[in-house]
Design a protein with these regions (language model features):
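N-terminal accessory segment detector
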Residues: 1-131, 137-154, 172-221
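Active-site helix/loop of acyl-thioester processing domains in fatty-acid/polyketide metabolism
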Residues: 152-168
Length: 221
């Protein structure tokens, strides 16, 4: 039985920090978007994202994927710092003190609230050193046309940087399936960079996700 006095004395349990209605604030007259702490948010139209892909492809060719990936790594580094600061202050504990399921749920809601689609993590291959990350309704996949390969390089860079800082290991992320190519989701394999060296070639050869994953695991065993 919960004591009434405890309910009156103890602070209210924190809810979902990244709940859209509470996290995103807007002023239509000024054209401003802010988060619940007053930090500025930036809304990017799909035409702008499409122009980034088209322009980089025309100017840099195949190097466009590296440019976007490195932009994602830089973005992910700053995103990780802000993410940790915000949830640590709200939940009154450090990221290291949080249960992994609690941390991932925060990241999932954050991903969705920022308009990046949905995000999920599959940890069943951690015994071999790999994490499988899955996103759906990616704004990046929806604007990149005619690349004939997975195109969410920004997201791959974000995942690489975010989880590298979270784990203290130098991790790398490579996309294996993409909504831009008709897949129902975007899948990424996350692991140590030296273990993922063969993946880029397998993706270029058109190998499916399961085949690539089996190849990686067999190379370790």
């Amino acid at each position: 039985m919960i004591e009434i006095n405890n309910l009156l004395i103890k602070p209210q349990l924190p809810g979902n920090y990244f709940a859209y209605d509470a996290y995103v604030k807007g002023d239509l007259e000024l054209g401003l978007l802010e988060n619940r702490l007053g930090g500025r948010l930036l809304g990017l139209p799909s035409t702008f994202l499409e122009a980034i892909y088209t322009g980089l492809e025309q100017e840099t060719g195949q190097a466009a994927r590296l440019v976007l990936f490195n932009c994602g790594r830089w973005w992910g580094k700053n995103f990780y710092v802000r993410f940790c600061e915000e949830i640590s202050e709200y939940y009154d504990k450090t990221v290291a003190q949080m249960e992994m399921i609690e941390l991932i749920q925060c990241l999932q809601q954050c991903w969705k609230t920022h308009g990046w689609g949905t995000f999920d993590l599959d940890a069943q291959h951690t015994n071999t050193g790999f994490l499988i990350l899955t996103t759906k309704n990616s704004p990046f996949a929806s604007v990149a046309k005619g690349w004939n390969r997975p195109v969410c390089f920004l997201e791959a860079g974000i995942f690489s940087s975010f989880f590298s800082q979270l784990t203290g290991r130098d991790l790398y992320s490579i996309q294996t399936t993409c909504e831009s190519m008709g897949a129902d989701s975007n899948q990424f394999i996350l692991g140590l960079s030296n273990r993922l060296q063969s993946v880029e070639a397998l993706v270029d050869q058109g190998k499916d996700h399961e085949t690539i994953l089996k190849t990686l695991i067999s190379n370790i065993n």
